[in-house]
C-alpha cells in the first residue's frame, strides 16, 4: 500500500530533500509518516480525522505542524527547526517549485539510543539525571500559559467529565481486560476522592496550578544527551494538554513505577516539589497517577 503512495515514495527518495542524505527510514504511526534522514527527521501528518484530532485538510495539517513546532520549542528549541512545504512540479520536492501539496515538520535527528526508556532498561539513568528533569519540568510549568479557559480544565466538573468518559469507554471490557471487582473498586475510590476534595481542586485553580502542560510526559518522549530534551508535546487537542501540573508529574512518575524504578519516581516527585514549591501536589498525585495509568491502559 505504501509503495502506491506518491508522497511516501517521493519522501523515500534522497533527491526530494534540500540537503544530502543517504538511506531514509520510514516510521509510521496511525497519525503520521516520519522520515528519518541522515541528520534530520521530517514528520508528515496523515489526512485523518479521529474526532479527537482532525488532519483531514491540507490547511489543518499545516496549522497542526505550526502548532507542534510552537509548543515543542518551549522545551526543545534546538531540535524543532521549521515547518517546510512539499511542492509538486515535475517531481515532489521539499521547498521546491510548484504547488504546495503537503507540509512537514523538520527536526534535528537525535540518536535513538539516547531515549530515556532504553537508558532506563540499561541502568544508565541516575538521580543526577532525574534531578535535571525535575528542574526542567518545574521551570517549564512555571512559565507555561494559564488563563480562565485553561483553568477550567482543572475544575472538578471537567476532571469528573474526563473520568466519566474513561469509565464509559472501558465498561465493555469488564471481565475481559479488567475484572469487574477492580473496575468497581476504582470507580468508587475515584468518585469518593472527587466528592470529598472539592476545596482542593478549587485551590489548585486559585494557585494557578492549571497550565498549558506537555500532555504526554513519559520516558519515551525524553532524550538524554548532554542536554535533556523533552519532546512530542500533544498539539492536536488542547484538552489533552490543559491540566493540573500534577498530571504531567504523575505521568512520568507512573511510567517510572511501571519500569520498576519506584526509587527514581519518588526522587523525581521530591525534587519537583523542591523546585516548584508545590507542596500541595502530593495530595493529588495518587489521583492523577491513577488517571494516567488508566488512560495508558485504555489506549494500549
Regions found by a protein language model. Name each.
Residues 1-106, 225-228:
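Conserved NTP-binding catalytic cores of kinases and kinase-like/nucleotidyltransferase enzymes
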Residues 52-56, 93-97, 105-219, 223-300:
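ATP-dependent phospho-/nucleotidyl transfer catalytic cores
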Amino acid at each position: 500500500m505504501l509503495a502506491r503512495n506518491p508522497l511516501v515514495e517521493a519522501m523515500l527518495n534522497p533527491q526530494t530533500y534540500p540537503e544530502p542524505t543517504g538511506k531514509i527510514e520510514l516510521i509510521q504511526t496511525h497519525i503520521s509518516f516520519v522520515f528519518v534522514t541522515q541528520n534530520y527527521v521530517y514528520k508528515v501528518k496523515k489526512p485523518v480525522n479521529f474526532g479527537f484530532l482532525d488532519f483531514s485538510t491540507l490547511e489543518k495539517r499545516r496549522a497542526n505542524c505550526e502548532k507542534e513546532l510552537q509548543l515543542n520549542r518551549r522545551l526543545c528549541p534546538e531540535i524543532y527547526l521549521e515547518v517546510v512545504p512539499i511542492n509538486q512540479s515535475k517531481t515532489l520536492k521539499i521547498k521546491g517549485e510548484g504547488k504546495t501539496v503537503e507540509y512537514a515538520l523538520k527536526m534535528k535527528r537525535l540518536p535513538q539510543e539516547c531515549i530515556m526508556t532504553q537508558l532506563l532498561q540499561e541502568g544508565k539513568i541516575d538521580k543526577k539525571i532525574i534531578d535535571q528533569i525535575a528542574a526542567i519540568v518545574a521551570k517549564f510549568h512555571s512559565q507555561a500559559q494559564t488563563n480562565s479557559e485553561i483553568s477550567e480544565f482543572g475544575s472538578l466538573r471537567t476532571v469528573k467529565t474526563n473520568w466519566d468518559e474513561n469509565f464509559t469507554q472501558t465498561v465493555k471490557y469488564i471481565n475481559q481486560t479488567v475484572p469487574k471487582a477492580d473496575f468497581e473498586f476504582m470507580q468508587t475510590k475515584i468518585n469518593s476522592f472527587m466528592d470529598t476534595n472539592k476545596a482542593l481542586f478549587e485551590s489548585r485553580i486559585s494557585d494557578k496550578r492549571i497550565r498549558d502542560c506537555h500532555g504526554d510526559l513519559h520516558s519515551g518522549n525524553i532524550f538524554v544527551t548532554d542536554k535533556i530534551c523533552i519532546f512530542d508535546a500533544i498539539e492536536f487537542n488542547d484538552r489533552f494538554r490543559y491540566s493540573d501540573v500534577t498530571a504531567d508529574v504523575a505521568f512520568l512518575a507512573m511510567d517510572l513505577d511501571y519500569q520498576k524504578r519506584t526509587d527514581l519516581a519518588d526522587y523525581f516527585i521530591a525534587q519537583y516539589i523542591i523546585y516548584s514549591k508545590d507542596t500541595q501536589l502530593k495530595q493529588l498525585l495518587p489521583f492523577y497517577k491513577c488517571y494516567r495509568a488508566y488512560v495508558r491502559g485504555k489506549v494500549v
